[in-house]
From Swiss-Prot:
Record's keyword terms, sorted: Cell outer membrane, Lipoprotein, Membrane, Palmitate, Signal
Name of this protein: 17 kDa surface antigen
Membrane topology type: Lipid-anchor
Lipidation (N-palmitoyl cysteine): C20
Family according to the record: Belongs to the rickettsiale 17 kDa surface antigen family.
Keyword match S-adenosyl-L-methionine: no
Lipidation (S-diacylglycerol cysteine): C20
A Pfam family this chain is assigned to: 17kDa_Anti_2
An annotated GO cellular component: cell outer membrane
Length: 154
């Protein structure tokens, strides 16, 4: 729990700094960097113990921030909303190996989520490994992640 608290503090500090980005506050790339970094840190925290776990958090945060910044630079709010809803649907209902697609008709951006593996982690939570692929302005980006059901069912 201490590690999760540290991650949340880092994410809050990063969002506060990013909000100082000038007029208009946080931009798409900044949002992608922040969310990618936080997600990467959370993913990295699932591996190792002690100092090894801290290394996992650091590496996950760095890789997530880089990839999230690249993807976020091209995604608009509508893209993110559609992609998030599609991700939830895919992780809840799609069989492993199947693509659940999304498309923004306003700008032509699209992507898909592919659940790859369902498992229970060391604390008994149900989890899924997945691949998220987005095509923004004709350029494809892939990200890999794990999502675990929380005790409240979310």
């Amino acid at each position: 729990m201490k590690l999760l608290s540290k991650i949340m503090i880092i994410a809050l500090a990063a969002s506060t700094l990013q909000a100082c980005n000038g007029p208009g506050g946080m931009n798409k790339q900044g949002t992608g960097t922040l969310l990618g970094g936080a997600g990467g840190a959370l993913l990295g925290s699932q591996f190792g113990k002690g100092k090894g776990q801290l290394v996992g958090v650091g590496v996950g945060a760095l890789l997530g921030a880089v990839l999230g910044g690249q993807v976020g630079a091209g995604m608009d709010e509508q893209d993110r909303r559609i992609a998030e809803l599609t991700s939830q649907k895919a992780l809840e209902t799609a069989p492993n190996g199947s693509n659940v697609e999304w498309r923004n008709p306003d700008n032509g951006n699209y992507g898909y989520v592919t659940p790859n593996k369902t498992y229970r982690n060391s604390t008994g939570q149900y989890c899924r490994e997945y691949t998220q692929t987005v095509v923004i302005g004709g350029k494809q980006q892939k990200a890999y992640g794990n999502a675990c059901r929380q005790p409240d069912g979310q």
